[in-house]
């Protein structure tokens, strides 16, 4: 298992596969599988039968994609970037965009 550099709420772009170029926010992270669910990406329609708990019908939902197929969006330029970890003067560890040096995520706000 690899160290994940993604968190819920991060802005990412798909860099490979059928959904290449689509942007979205991370809705859920599955660290044990190294997969994430991104809003508006890998959307499928599922046909469900009616039962006592719910009605039947067609529902749309996002399926997980592997983290190797996504890249963070640089907050400064808006382009895909790699992520590094950096320690600030106060000793806190933050995620930084390698291209611009901007802090990524809630730590930067």
UniProtKB/Swiss-Prot annotation:
The UniProt function text for this chain reads: One of two assembly initiator proteins, it binds directly to the 5'-end of the 23S rRNA, where it nucleates assembly of the 50S subunit. One of the proteins that surrounds the polypeptide exit tunnel on the outside of the subunit.
Top-rank taxon of the source lineage equals Bacteria
- Keywords for this protein: Ribonucleoprotein, Ribosomal protein, RNA-binding, rRNA-binding
Quote the Pfam families the UniProt record gives: KOW (PF00467), ribosomal_L24 (PF17136)
- Ranges in a coiled coil: none
Provide the assembly information: Part of the 50S ribosomal subunit.
Which SMART domains does this chain map to?
A: KOW (SM00739)
In the record, biological process GO terms are:
translation
Descriptive protein name: Large ribosomal subunit protein uL24
